Amino acid sequence: MSLRLLGHIELPAHAKEGGFDHAAVHHESSRLYVAHTSNDDVDVIDSASDRFLRSIHGLKGAAGVLVSDERSLLFTANRGENTISILSAGREQEMLRLFSGIRPNGLAFDPSRGLLLVANVGDPEIGNSSTASMIDVDRKTVIGSVVLPGRPRWAVYDERTTAFYLNIADPPLIVKIDAKTPSKMLERYKMPAKGPHGLDLDPRGRYLFCACDGAKLVAVHLDSGEIRLVGELSGPPDVVFFNPNLSHVYVAVGTPGVIDVFDARRMKLLETVPTEKGAHTLAVAQRENKVYAFLPATHRAATYRDE
């Protein structure tokens, strides 16, 4: 199987320096949301027709984007104003905006408890400002916070262990935070490569896939604790997505501008697909096995089908 280029979607031009960041798909409405950080927007794409629909404005420094299909919610981390927003996915109506911490970025959600973990990058000039905040979405309040051992990157939630897993850039770790005790870390996994960055979960296979700035893809088995090197990457990565339909892992590498595709069962590299220099983020529409790479130099999205 391989990624076949279907075409490109024109997106709004950048209003200032920067480009795109995290993206996510709401599968019921076929809406694809991507943080357009340079515009303080989230751009909305119809993933069924591959058309740009509109932009959601006023999300200063939009960085993290996450969708809960279970609750039809859209979450954004607004790094430029230290807030998170909660919107109705599919309709894009803002329901809540809340202070979360300093420079929020990574997001993960427990749909059964309605708990949103926010990874706050922090400010080097402010001590203990790299934190993880836990927000009770139903109560609309922060219910816990923990100081992290370093700058956080992305995060995921695992239903079986009822825990959040969060990348720390330096020291290179993945930390575990139980949803029931959000003010403390339970466990730390030491990564064999520098700069854990992108993170995603294979819930059936029980593996976390961590893409590290040291150009390595690392897998952590959540049941056994085994840590293994999956393979070398084409360069320093950013976003990682796991596709459960095909058991493929997609890693966006901005320099030189490629997607590295791995087989999650055999733990091997399948192919490397050129995108565009600077294309460090992507999204996956699982129903159609589509992969979207966001191209900052030309403010477009490249659409691929994994087939």
Residue ranges and their predicted role:
Residues 1-307:
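Predominantly soluble domains enriched in secretory-pathway, periplasmic, or organellar proteins
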